[in-house]
Amino acid sequence: MKVIKRDGRAVDYDREKIRIAIDKANQEVRPRERATKEEVKEIINYIEELGKKRILVEDIQDIIEEKLMEVQKYELAKKYIVYRYTRALVRKQNTTDESILGLIRNENKELAEENSNKNTMLASTQRDYIAGEVSRDLTKRMLLPEKISKAHEEGILHFHDADYFIQPIFNCCLIDIGNMLDNGTVMNGKMIESPKSFQVACTVTTQIIAAVASNQYGGQSVDMIHLGKYLRKSYNKFKKEIEEKYGDKLKSDIIEDLVQNRLKAELKAGVQTIQYKINTLMTTNGQSPFVTLFLHLEKDDPYIKENAMIIEEILRQRYQGIKNEAGVYVTPAFPKLVYVLDEFNSLKGGEYDYLTKLAVKCSAKRMYPDYISAKKMRENYEGNVFSPMGCRSFLSPWKDENGNYKFEGRFNQGVVSINLPQIGIIAEGDEEKFWKLLDERLELCKEALMCRHYALLGTHSDISPIHWQYGALARLKKGETIDKLLYGGYSTISLGYIGIYELTKLMKGVSQTEPEGHDFALKVMKHLNEATQRWKKETNIGFALYGTPAESLCYRFARIDKERFGTIKDVTDKGYYTNSYHVDVREKIDAFEKLKFESEFQNISTGGAISYIEIPNMSKNIDALESVVKFIYDNIQYAEFNTKSDYCHVCGFDGEIIINKDNEWECPNCGNKDHNKMSVVRRTCGYLGENFWNVGKTKEIKQRVLHL
C-alpha cells in the first residue's frame, strides 16, 4: 500500500509510524485514558484490511481519530487532534530556507533547470529566484485556498507562475507599439516623444520591451509593421539633407543612390540595435526579455516597401547569428521571430516570395522564424491575423465601441493547467469514471483561475505605468483601476492542458494517431473547450483553451505520478509527459502527416497552440523545406522547425552536441561535458532555450525522431 503525502509524494505504508504517533499522544494522557497495545493493533489492522492500493495520509489520521473515539479514549483522541494540528502549523511555517540556500550554493538542481533561459549562476538571476521562492511559499501557505494548494502539490493541476503571484502582475501581452511610437510614452518619469528616424524608433522599441518585461512575467510581442513609417521618415530626412547639400551639383539618380546607401546603413544599424539589445539586456526577471517580433505584410499598407526591407534585414541578421564569447556566430534564443505566410508570399509566384525563401533559409540554420498561415488563421479568428503573445498564447477576437477589432494592447491574466494523464491513470479505462473525474477537476481549475483573476481585480494603474498609463496596454489615469480590462473578453485567462497522448494511451491503449484514439482525443479537446466557453458566459471573463508549453511541467507531472502510481509503460516510464495535443515525440510520422493531423487540434485550442517538425540539417536541401512551408500555408495555422545548432568551446566542434547514455550533454568530438564550455540551443517548447533543461525535458529532447 502506498501513502500519499500532502506534497503529492507516494511513500510505502509503514505501520510503525502509526504506532509511534499514537504512543506519543499516549504519553501525554492519564494511564486509564491510554490506548492499549491491542487497541492500537486493531486500528492498524483496520487500516490494512481496507485493502487499498493507495491511501491519503489525511484519511489515515481521520481513521485513527474515529477509532479512538469508538473505544471512548476521548482525552487521547483530543491529544492526537492537537498533535495533528501542531504538525499542520509547522507545515504552515516558512519553508524557503533550504531551497534558497541551495540556490545560492548552486545545489538546487531542480530550480536551476526550471527555465532554460535563466542562468542561475548570475547574481541578478538568483535575486529573481530568491524572490520567487518567497512568493511560492506565501502563495502556498497564505494566498491560495488550501484545496488549490493541495491540488497543485498532488499534481492534479499546476498553478503557473506562483513565483510572481504575490504581486498583481499578469502573464503575456501584445504591446501596442504603434500607439506608443506615434503618440509618445513615458519611462521612468521621462517623456519619450514620437521618433523622427528609424534608428531612434528601434532604440525606443527596445527600451519599451525592457520596461514591459520587467513588469510582467510572461512573453510579449511586437508587430514590426509599425516601424515602416519611421524608415520612410529616415528616407525623407536623408533625401532632404543630400538635396540641400548637393542638389545643384548631382543628378537625381546619384542623389537617390546616396540616399539609399545611408538608408541601408541606418536600416542595418537599427535592426542590429534591436537584436543585440534584446540579447544583452537583463530585466528584473533575471533573463533577457522574452519577446517575439511579428513579421508580416499587408497589401494596403502605405509602407509595405519599407516593411519588406525591415523584414529582409531582420532575417539576414538572424541568419548570420550573434557572436559568442569565442567569437563564433551562434543561434540566439531571442527575439523569437514569427513570419506570416499570405497569398503574396506563400511560394506560389507572389511578389514577396523572395522574403519567404530567405525565411526558410534562415529557419534551416537558426530554427527561427516560425510560420503562421494567414489563410488558416483567418478561418479561426473571424478573418483576423495577429501575433501570438510570446510563444503560443492567442487572444480571442474582441471589438471596441466602434465595432473595430483590436488585438494590440491586450493581455493574458494567467494560466492553470490540468494533468490529463493522472485522470486517465485513476480512471483505469472506465470512461464514465473518467468524464466524472475530469469535470470535478475542471471545476478545481476554474476556481484556481478565478484566484488569478481576483488577484488582479482592484489593481491600480500605478503598479506599472508603462503598461497601464503610457500605452503598452492602456492609457488609464493615475490611481485608476484596471478592472474594466479584466472583463468582457478584453483580456484572456487560460485553461492549459498536457498529455493528450498519454491520456489516450491509458484510456484506449493506442496513440491519438490511431482512429479510436483520434476520436477520443478530439472528444476530450472539445470537452475542455466547451468548459472554457461555458465559464466565459457565466463570468464575462475571457476564458480560453491553451496548449501548455510545459518546459518544466512535462517532468513535474510525470515525476509526481510515477511516485504515486508507479511505473506505467508509455506514460510514467518515459520521465516526461507529451506537450499539449502533440504526437508522441518517439512516433515515426512524416512531416506532412504530422502537421495535417495536429492542425485539427490547433483549431480547437484557440487560446494557444503550436506544432513542430523535427528536421536534420537542411542547409543543402532548402527546396524540401520550402515544400513544407507551402504545405503549412494551406494546412495549419502555426508551425515551426526544430534542428540542431551547437558549438563546443573546447575543440571548436560545430554540429550537434549529443545527449549520452547517462542523459548528459556531450561533445561527440572531444567528449566535453562542461555546460559552461559549450553552446547548445534547442527548441524547448515553442521558443528556444540555451541554458540547458531539467532531466525530463532532456529525455524528451533525446527521444525526438526526425519527421523529414
Put a short name on every predicted segment:
Residues I18, I22, L227, L231, ...:
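Buried hydrophobic packing segments
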